[in-house]
């Protein structure tokens, strides 16, 4: 019985358990866009008035129509016009005649936006497109067009002309690099304006995609090749697909953004070159779970288009080598024993008779693809001459020291002169951007026939920041036991105050290491009552498990059979669980970027109500400030004036972390929780950070029992060894030297 309810039954206080029904698990968000508000409507009205003054009354109808299209993005407009909504949601269910009529109407209505409209939409959705090429490569006319048009005296104009060839200021450089390409207003434009495959457009509609997210709004027109990208001259209107760096929030639809252009490009290539078959696109992801997810999403989009999407697996052949069949025959002839031939039978099937993988899009992790190209590093790296698109998902991890060499080897193996590279992530530092520019330049020098394309960067929102549609909580727990009690309080909430954090399953729990994940799983194994499913509702996932076990756990979590999943940073990136209500950082992340990706597992596609809880102890205090800063920026971006989870006094009190300690934290995590520590003080730290609620007395009893069993086994083994040595000694005495014979 709740005493608070009993004592307040005659009052009109609101129940503390009443929560808004908006949770990520309740369903799809009405609008998946993260950045939308009243500011967009004001800018759109201003642009409409500008067009009215510029044009005569005959353009008034066009202005009103454009205003309606722009109002499509505003928050005040709760719904899309019924005609467009019906056409979008029905998708392929509409008859062919009606679809063709709607397409012809949309062709007639599609008109290119002027720069004011493009700027309005892109700024309202916090989309920034920048040309990353050197200033020497940019058109001088572009620089001049960005200068403010003001009346100047002749002397000032002459001075400005003299200073023009010299180095520009930072502000002028930013203006020269800034671009405002045509945005994607709705997914219907993919078919009407950008002429994508009819079947691909139907598949997109069947998936229920109606409103493009910010990253789709900005990147799809660029990658589909129908948006004019500045080239070498100001009058160049030839549309070209650029190399692209994309920094967009987690759960914003980056997979769809790079899969649609790749599939459409391959469909066109199949029509123009039906005899040419092979791997035309390579998608690289850091984990098997993310690679498998990309394959599933790609197959949904490519259904019925003739494009095959394949997941790279061990033993697959992706290239054909010279004299490969002869090598296999020599190996088979050199073995003669029956047992060895029986063991070699599956290997022969994989090496000799197995044909080259017939796929258009290959999705792989870096190591598997490098091993396939180099025959497990026994031969020189083979080339992929037909690959025209290279996609690096979670590019900041792929170009980190852990995967950097393998990723660059894959990049160099793609030798097609028209190769386009696109890098995607929610966090991307300047070092990653510089590495991408350097790699593109080196590839151009090593392959003279390589064509040069613009290198653009698209940033959505604030760079390297957490999504604003989730609630962040930073909780001080003092000790490991305090964190465990706080976690159990989340699973079994009993408090009646409205300020308490409430988290409904399903949710993820992140730990620093695999042993800690296993220990936490065993500690929470029986916290869920049998009536609710018991221990089957909680699972642990880490890289030490087999591929089959990992796949089964992922399926169970997606189906809703598993409610709580304890894991490491294996699931921190890219994996899309759309119904997760929250994330618990049981151990603080190793870097701010890891925090952004961890909490991004909830609040996918604009879903509201997600919660991110981070526990920290006394040992974590030196490392918490960077996380607190991210939470503070995210809450400011959200724009609410309520109580903040990170107060100003806390930000001022937390210590700053040096660069050396940041690198150490990123590599090894918090020292107190590292595995394999040696020394008396380190052992003491490990005992302090142990995940357990057992008392020291119980642990000592268990330890003594284990030692007694080990000592007994040792004695038994010693007795056996002694008996064997005695019998061996007797035999030696019988066979030994018995003296000289008489």
Curated annotation (Swiss-Prot):
Helicase C-terminal domain residues: 486-654
InterPro entries noted in UniProt: DDX52/Rok1_DEADc, DEAD/DEAH_box_helicase_dom, DEAD_box_RNA_helicase, Helicase_ATP-bd, Helicase_C-like, P-loop_NTPase
Motif (DEAD box): 393-396
Record's compositionally biased regions (Acidic residues): 102-113, 322-341, 727-742
The UniProt record lists the keyword Cytoplasm: no
Family matches, as SMART domains: DEXDc, HELICc
Catalytic EC class: hydrolase
Compositional bias of kind Basic and acidic residues: 696-705
GO biological process, one term: maturation of SSU-rRNA
GO cellular component: nucleolus
Locus of motif Q motif: 189-217
All copies of domain Helicase ATP-binding, residue ranges: 235-446
Subcellular location: Nucleus, Nucleolus
Sequence ranges of Basic residues compositional bias: 662-671
Record region (Disordered): 1-113, 138-177, 320-357, 662-742
Keyword annotations of the record: ATP-binding, Helicase, Hydrolase, Nucleotide-binding, Nucleus, Ribosome biogenesis, RNA-binding, rRNA processing
Family label: Belongs to the DEAD box helicase family. DDX52/ROK1 subfamily.
Self-association state and partner proteins as the record states: Interacts with the U3 snoRNA and is associated with the 90S and 40S pre-ribosomes.
Protein's name according to its UniProt entry: ATP-dependent RNA helicase rok1
The species this protein was found in: Emericella nidulans (strain FGSC A4 / ATCC 38163 / CBS 112.46 / NRRL 194 / M139) (Aspergillus nidulans)
Gene from which this protein is expressed: rok1
């Amino acid at each position: 019985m709740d005493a608070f309810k009993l004592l307040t039954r005659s009052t009109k206080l609101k129940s503390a358990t009443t929560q808004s029904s908006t949770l990520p698990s309740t369903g799809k968000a009405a609008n998946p866009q993260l950045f939308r508000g009243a500011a967009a409507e004001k800018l759109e009205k201003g642009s409409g008035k500008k067009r009215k003054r510029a044009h005569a009354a005959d353009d008034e109808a066009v202005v009103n129509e454009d205003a309606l299209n722009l109002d499509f993005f505003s928050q005040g407009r709760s719904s899309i016009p019924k005609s467009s909504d019906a056409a979008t949601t029905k998708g392929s269910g509409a008859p062919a005649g009606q679809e063709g009529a709607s397409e012809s109407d949309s062709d007639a209505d599609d008109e290119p936006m002027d720069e004011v409209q493009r700027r309005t939409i892109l700024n309202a959705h916090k989309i920034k497109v920048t040309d990353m090429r050197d200033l020497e490569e940019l058109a001088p006319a572009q620089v001049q067009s960005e200068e403010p048009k003001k009346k100047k005296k002749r002397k000032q104009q002459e001075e400005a002309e003299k200073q023009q060839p010299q180095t520009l200021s930072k502000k002028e450089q930013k203006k020269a690099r800034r671009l405002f390409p045509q945005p994607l207003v709705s997914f219907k434009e993919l078919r009407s304006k950008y002429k994508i495959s009819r079947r691909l457009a139907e598949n997109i509609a069947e998936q229920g995609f109606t409103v493009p997210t910010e990253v789709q709004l900005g990147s799809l027109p660029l990658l589909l090749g129908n948006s004019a990208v500045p080239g070498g001259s100001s009058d160049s209107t030839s549309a070209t697909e650029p190399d692209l760096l994309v920094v967009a929030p987690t759960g914003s639809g980056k997979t769809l953004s790079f899969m649609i252009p790749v599939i459409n490009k391959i469909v066109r290539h199949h029509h123009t070159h039906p005899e040419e078959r092979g791997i035309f696109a390579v998608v690289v992801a850091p984990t098997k779970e993310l690679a498998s997810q990309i394959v599933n999403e790609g197959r949904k989009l490519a259904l019925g288009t003739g494009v095959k999407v394949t997941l790279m697996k061990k033993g697959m052949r992706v290239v054909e080598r010279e004299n490969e069949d002869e090598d296999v025959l020599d190996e088979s002839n050199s073995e003669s024993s029956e047992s060895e031939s029986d063991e070699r039978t599956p290997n022969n099937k994989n090496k000799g008779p197995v044909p080259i993988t017939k796929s258009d899009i290959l999705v792989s992790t870096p190591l598997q693809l490098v091993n396939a190209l180099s025959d497990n590093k026994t031969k020189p790296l083979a080339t992929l001459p037909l690959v025209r698109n290279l996609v690096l998902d979670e590019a900041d991890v792929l170009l980190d020291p852990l995967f950097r060499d393998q990723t660059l080897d894959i990049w160099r193996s793609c030798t097609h002169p028209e190769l386009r590279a696109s890098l995607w992530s929610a966090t991307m530092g300047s070092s990653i951007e510089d590495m991408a520019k350097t790699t593109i330049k080196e590839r151009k020098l090593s392959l003279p026939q390589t064509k040069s394309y613009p290198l653009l960067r698209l940033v959505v929102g604030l760079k390297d920041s957490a999504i604003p549609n989730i609630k962040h909580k930073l909780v001080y727990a003092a000790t490991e036991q305090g964190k465990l009690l706080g976690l159990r309080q989340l699973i079994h909430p009993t408090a009646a105050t409205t300020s308490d954090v409430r988290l409904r399953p399903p949710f993820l729990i992140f730990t620093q290491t695999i042993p800690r994940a296993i220990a936490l799983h065993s500690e929470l194994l029986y916290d869920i009552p049998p009536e609710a499913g018991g221990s089957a509702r909680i699972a642990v996932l880490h890289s030490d498990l087999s591929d089959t076990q990992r796949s089964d756990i992922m399926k169970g979590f997606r189906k809703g059979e598993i409610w709580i999943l304890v894991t490491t940073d294996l699931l921190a990136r890219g994996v899309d669980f759309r119904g997760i209500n929250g994330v618990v950082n049981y151990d603080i992340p190793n870097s701010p970027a890891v925090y952004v990706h961890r909490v991004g597992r909830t609040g996918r596609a604009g879903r509201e109500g997600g919660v991110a809880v981070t526990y920290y102890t006394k040992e974590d205090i030196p490392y918490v400030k960077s996380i607190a800063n991210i939470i503070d920026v995210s809450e400011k971006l959200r724009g609410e004036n309520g109580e903040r989870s990170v107060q100003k006094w806390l930000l001022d009190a937390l210590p700053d972390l040096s660069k050396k300690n940041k690198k150490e934290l990123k590599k090894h995590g918090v020292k107190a929780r590292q595995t394999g520590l040696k020394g008396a003080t380190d052992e003491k730290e490990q005992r302090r950070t142990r995940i357990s609620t057992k008392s020291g007395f119980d642990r000592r009893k268990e330890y003594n029992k284990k030692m007694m069993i080990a000592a007994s086994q040792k004695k038994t083994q010693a007795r056996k060894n002694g008996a064997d040595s005695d019998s061996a000694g007797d035999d030696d005495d019988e066979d030994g030297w018995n003296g000289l014979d008489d």
